[in-house]
């Protein structure tokens, strides 16, 4: 009984630390989002390489999940979102590839036999083992490079937005 109580206390402390980190980061994310919106609004349609309008022939679907389970619908919501994006591509006769980031997304891609995007190394399984800005930047830069060089005409992100410990918005 005491071991279970101690484990609950440790888990609660870890959860609180993670929540505090996310809460402290939220103002920066909001400010960054505002800055990006201003830059995007100031560009004329089709002016930048990332705002170019093109016929969508090939889509990259980036599915971001955790590496572990036991987190309720957290991973399932992302897989459902990615599945609906895959179905939309199939209905529109668009080629697609899935970039699974996180072990659960990779498992789903293998189980559902989705074509996995190439050129990202082992990011599917290693990104969240040692998550830092440099590693995440490498993946983001490769996604942007493949969009810029025309490998993909559209990029769809499937992820959860943190609201609180019990609720994540897909």
Where in this protein do the model-derived segments appear?
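Conserved loop-to-helix interface motifs that mediate assembly, gating, or partner/ligand docking
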Residues: 1-170
């Amino acid at each position: 009984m005491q071991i279970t109580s101690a484990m609950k206390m440790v888990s609660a402390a870890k959860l609180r630390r993670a929540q505090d980190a996310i809460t402290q980061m939220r103002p920066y994310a909001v400010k960054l989002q505002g800055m990006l919106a201003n830059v995007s609004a100031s560009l004329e349609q089709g002016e930048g390489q990332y705002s170019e309008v093109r016929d969508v022939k090939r889509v990259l679907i980036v599915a971001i999940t955790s590496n572990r389970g036991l987190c309720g619908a957290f991973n399932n919501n992302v897989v459902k979102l990615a599945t609906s994006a895959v179905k939309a591509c199939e209905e529109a006769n668009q080629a697609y590839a899935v970039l699974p980031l996180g072990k659960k997304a990779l498992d789903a891609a293998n189980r559902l036999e989705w074509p996995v995007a190439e050129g990202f190394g082992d990011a599917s399984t290693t990104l969240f083992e040692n998550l830092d800005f440099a590693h995440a930047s490498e993946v983001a830069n490769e996604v942007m490079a493949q969009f810029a060089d025309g490998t993909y005409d559209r990029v769809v992100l499937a992820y959860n937005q943190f609201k609180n410990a019990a609720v994540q918005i897909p």
